[in-house]
Amino acid sequence: MEKNVIERALLCSLFLDQVAILEVVGLLRPEMFSDPDHGFIYEAFTDLFNRNKRPDLILVEEEMKKKDPERYLKMGGIAYLSDGMETVRLEHNAVEYAREIFRHYLLACMHKLFVQKASECLQYGTDCHKVI
């Protein structure tokens, strides 16, 4: 499944099932989303949650406006999630979506590390033991 689809499904699930955030908040951080806009929405959602507020579309949108008005305007708010709200039928899958996002994030981190190590290997005089 495409990363953006999973990320949108998770965000929609969090709005539909307020209990899911309890399981997801310890697993994901905003920077783990491949789409920075999704991470921005998640950050606004979790910031509200951490202040003991029940996040909904209106509160999250207001939080986004406060956090970064320019970014909020550039991305057009969270209106594009409204389509996803109609397609996400099983909000109980939020934890599975979060685990998949986490898995993709770990793979991206590993890829970045391997590219860095490959670059080190190609430099003259590199000690192979230090690279490993």
Map each language-model feature to its residues:
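Noncatalytic partner-interaction/assembly domains of nucleic-acid and motor enzyme complexes
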Residues: M1-Y105
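Non-catalytic interaction/clamp surfaces of large macromolecular machines
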Residues: K112, E120-I132
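Hydrophobic alpha-helical hairpins/lids featuring a short glycine-rich hinge
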Residues: L106-F114
